[in-house]
């Protein structure tokens, strides 16, 4: 075999590239997210105040300059939340979503858990002050059932009131900020609001399940890996913003325009500053601003019911629309099956039917390539010293016989959007968390874990997962049934390793995803067994050479 380019080598390279796409695609997908606009460096607070026609607020005197040593912690619990409020910054330092009443264990999540020594969620500060208001010691002025009121007053300057209303029937927190101008001149109060979300212990190894989002005219998103490397800043008009992790979301919509959003990672927590446009308060007057907060599971129908666009977080990304369609189809099917495993099987079967014509075209392409092998080998032998002439004649041969040398890879390429969409749906849809299928498959969002091992093994880890091995076996069978197209023995050996590579990639994938791929392989095997052998029709000049 000549060492120059050959159709067999091209086929192998095409297949290898298809496999590589499945492995590296999540990293490449970030390129499809719109880049956030760079924010100019912020001017010093005092300079900003001068530009606005104001005198900068002078630092307060007395003990305010000292960090409060003992902020009070107020604990609260209702049907949906466990929360701890701190008088330091009038903020939430611990927030737990207790889970759906009908399924507490599967849907419970710790959304934030700080030490209480630093300001927490919903801490606010005025950016034209030289002192950080988020570290001021507020007074708990009123507590009435699910509502809390905190007050901080700077004598002769302003009175700042924060009110929290914790819903016991839906995952909603209503926040009010009241600013009263105690001075004798109109003042501007530019506010930064702090947001925070705790990552789970294993989220550092997952993709697209811990993100920052902001809505301008579309969802701007960045995962925590990108935030760690480059940061995430959005400037311009922002309607709402938030932080996401696997299954859960913290989303905030103010009733005033936000002008910027800066996100940073500290330890295992994402922190963000939502920068609001300045609030103008006349002398002796007060103004109240409202913040609508959702802190709970990422459920499409729930998010859509608010009518503010929160549901768009579930259709973000390059394949976001297809993911949403897949999710809605599974929800519809679930009304009748009551089991998400059967829903996955049903959707896999329907998708296989949809792609059947293209799969048949792929089989036809591979059969033609096999039939053309003698002609291709003849061209290679005649022009082995002239690669340009050899490649030209090979392309003419493909064109004359209407065959695409990469046609055999078509079914694999078509599965990429489905594969990625299934993966993301399994990582976003809380209803699939802990959802069992049959026999040993107890959680479709996790590896199937037939057996737990008493030790950790390389690659395998501490569990024996059977489903990826069944998938690997189905790939070997499918590979045997595919026409090899006269591949040289060394290339056939390389091709034979593809199932092993897939087995390695899929071993720790969610069992729902492996189930989809395994069933797709089984259906392909059945299809190849039922379909009659392809009758290859070559050009009459080439048919006599086969």
Over which residues does each language-model region extend?
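Low-complexity, compositionally biased segments
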Residues: 11-13, 50, 103, 108, ...
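Juxtamembrane extramembrane loops of integral membrane proteins
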Residues: 27-106, 150
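Soluble non-transmembrane domains of integral membrane proteins
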Residues: 73, 77-312
């Amino acid at each position: 075999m000549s060492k120059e380019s050959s159709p067999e080598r091209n086929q192998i390279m095409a297949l290898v590239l298809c496999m590589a796409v499945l492995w590296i695609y999540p990293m490449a997908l970030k390129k499809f997210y719109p880049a956030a606009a760079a924010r100019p460096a912020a001017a010093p607070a005092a300079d900003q105040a001068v530009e606005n026609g104001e005198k900068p607020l002078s630092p307060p005197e007395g003990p305010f300059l000292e960090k409060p040593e003992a902020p009070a912690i107020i604990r609260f619990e209702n049907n949906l939340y466990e929360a701890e409020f701190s008088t330091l910054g009038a903020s939430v330092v611990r927030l737990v979503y207790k889970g759906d009443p009908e399924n507490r264990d599967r849907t419970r999540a710790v959304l934030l858990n700080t030490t209480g020594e630093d300001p927490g969620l919903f801490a606010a500060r005025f950016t034209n002050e030289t002192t950080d208001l988020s570290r001021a010691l507020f007074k708990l002025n009123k507590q009435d059932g699910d509502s809390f009121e905190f007050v901080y007053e700077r004598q002769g300057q302003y009175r700042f009131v924060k009110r929290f209303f914790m819903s016991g029937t839906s995952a909603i927190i209503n926040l009010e900020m009241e600013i009263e101008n105690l001075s004798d001149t109109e003042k501007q109060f530019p506010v930064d609001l702090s947001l925070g979300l705790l990552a789970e212990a294993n989220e550092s190894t997952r993709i697209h399940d811990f993100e920052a989002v902001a809505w301008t005219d579309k969802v701007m998103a960045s995962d925590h890996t990108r935030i760690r490397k480059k940061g995430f800043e959005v400037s311009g008009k922002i309607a709402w913003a938030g932080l996401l992790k696997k299954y859960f979301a913290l989303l905030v919509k103010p009733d005033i325009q936000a002008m910027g959003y800066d996100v940073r990672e500290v330890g295992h927590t994402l922190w963000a500053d939502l920068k609001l446009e300045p609030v103008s308060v006349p002398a002796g007057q007060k103004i109240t601003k409202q913040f609508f907060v959702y802190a709970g599971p990422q459920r499409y129908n729930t998010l859509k019911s608010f009518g503010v666009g929160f549901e768009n977080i579930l259709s973000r990304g390059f394949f976001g629309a297809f993911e949403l369609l897949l999710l809605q189809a599974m929800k519809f099917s679930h009304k009748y099956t009551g089991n998400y495993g059967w829903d996955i099987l049903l959707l896999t079967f329907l998708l296989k039917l949809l792609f059947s014509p293209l799969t048949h075209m792929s089989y036809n392409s591979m059969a033609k390539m096999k039939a053309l092998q003698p002609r291709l080998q003849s061209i290679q032998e005649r022009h082995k010293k002239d690669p340009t002439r050899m490649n030209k004649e090979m392309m003419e041969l493909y064109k004359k016989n209407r065959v695409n040398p990469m046609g055999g890879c078509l079914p694999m390429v078509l599965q990429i959007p489905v594969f990625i969409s299934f993966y993301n749906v399994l990582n976003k849809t809380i209803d699939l968390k802990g959802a069992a299928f049959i026999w040993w498959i107890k959680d479709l969002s996790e590896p199937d874990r037939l057996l737990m091992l008493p030790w950790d093994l390389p690659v395998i880890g501490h569990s024996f997962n059977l489903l990826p091995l069944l998938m690997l076996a189905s790939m070997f069978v499918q590979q045997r049934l595919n026409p090899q197209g006269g591949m040289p023995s060394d290339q056939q050996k390389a091709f034979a390793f593809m199932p092993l590579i897939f087995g390695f990639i899929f071993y720790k994938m969610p069992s729902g995803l492996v189930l989809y791929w395994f069933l797709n392989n089984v259906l392909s095997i059945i299809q190849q067994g039922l379909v009659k052998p392809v009758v290859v029709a070559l050009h009459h000049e080439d048919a006599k050479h086969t």
